[in-house]
Amino acid sequence: MSNIVSPFSGSSRTTSDVGKQAGGTSDEKLIESLFSEKAVKEIAAECKLGCYNYLKSNEPRNYIDLVPKSHVSAWLSWATSKYDKGELPSRGFMNVPRIVCFLVRTTDSAESGSITVSLCDSGKAARAGVLEAIDNQEATIQLSALPALIALTPSYDCPMEVIGGDSGRNRCFGIATQLSGVVGTTGSVAVTHAYWQANFKAKPNNYKLHGPATIMVMPFDRLRQLDKKSLKNYIRGISNQSVDHGYLLGRPLQSVDQVAQEDLLVEESESPSALGRGVKDSKSVSASSVAGLPVSSPTLRIK
């Protein structure tokens, strides 16, 4: 058996219905049920891997395990039996190289307050009675500064064990989030989108300690590429679908084809035929024409 078994990894497209508890008639069948493609999707869905988690002002603290309880229990039961027989050097360790969280604001930029994201160990939480960050893997960002990416990494592998006796809780890495300073806003003020990959190992190790990494993301500029041509096409796309083809104030509207032919916001250049007669074609532009309503006919200007 390999020293490392990968239970899952995924992204926002990782979705599946929650399945049944893993089981099998042999070691091979059990391993298949634990780490098959179907099982990977099921446990990813259980722990909301790649799913958005809503941070609400009335629920400022949130926590999720990086591996669901049912999967840890199944692995621990199998590994313990192998360990007791001397077939494995340990009951197993959880290895998580890194966790990346994408934070997005869902309120206006003037909103006060901040978000703190922490990497936790439920074993430490059980001893301390509070969710504390391990290895200083904690970062705080102001809501007004979002969007942002936060990367966290532990310096050790988490033992696969039960805390508090046989009926206790499985020890596991987890992500805790906390809202602070949010005033006067109800509902969700931000969402987090976490990505990670967890491995089960028979042999543990320690790793170089790194501080949490925070990367500010440039907000998408929806107007930067909006030149006159794209603005004209945008208006046409809206107005042509919303034109009422009935009567307006007793007068028939122009057809959609006629409206689409009008050159909004841009004065046409002189046409060869007009130049020959000393005449310039021009299109009248008004609030009505921009809104998709009929525009006046071309006018002639005599030089």
From Swiss-Prot:
Coiled coil: none annotated. It is found in: Host cell junction, Host plasmodesma. Residues 1-24, 267-303 are annotated as: Disordered. Phosphorylated by host. It holds the Pfam family 3A. InterPro entries: MPV. It comes from the Viruses. One of its GO terms (biological process) is transport of virus in host, cell to cell. The keyword Transport applies. Its main location: host cell. Keywords: Host cell junction, Transport, Viral movement protein. GO terms for cellular component: host cell plasmodesma. Residues 1-18 have a biased composition (Polar residues). Transports viral genome to neighboring plant cells directly through plasmosdesmata, without any budding. The movement protein allows efficient cell to cell propagation, by bypassing the host cell wall barrier. Acts by forming a tubular structure at the host plasmodesmata, enlarging it enough to allow free passage of virion capsids. Belongs to the bromovirus movement protein family. This is Movement protein.
